[in-house]
Amino acid sequence: MVYIIKYIQVNKKRGSKYMERKQAKDLLDFIYDSPTAFHAVETVKNILDENGFREIKESDKWHLKSRDKYYVIKNDSSIMAFIVGDEKIEETGLRLIGAHTDAPGFRVKPNPQMISEGKYVKLNTEMYGGPIISTWYDRPLALAGKVAIKGASPLKPETRLVNINKPMMIIPNIAIHMN
């Protein structure tokens, strides 16, 4: 939402057709840049930073000030942003807007590589979120997510976002005569 509001404010003087096209393009860019909830949080975080919001940690004691803008990230997959009003919440209330950023798909399991017949590699995956399986068959698929790599301590690996935005794999459908 902040993403779209930002461009409405900047471009509202240029006419509604321009605004509509710009908003549509910005939304598509956001979707392409955010193939997972982790990527969406990173994209929203960058937008919030550009618009004067400050990150606060869930575990810290909060010292909120009127009219200040804040956000909190949880598990790198959820983000909550808010602006503190200058009136008493008991009198004026509270307004919240929420969005869901994860989607059905397949998650790669730890120890993902499965060699089949010594000729090709299969990924060991699990379904997430109840996808409609038939829509995934016989189409090129990319790979995106969060990976853990060796860090300074074995107990604290570093994480990186990965988005290999090109066709890498396919889930083949069963032959028509076998279905």
Regions found by a protein language model. Give the residues of each.
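N-terminal hydrophobic/helix-forming segments and targeting peptides
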Residues: 2-179
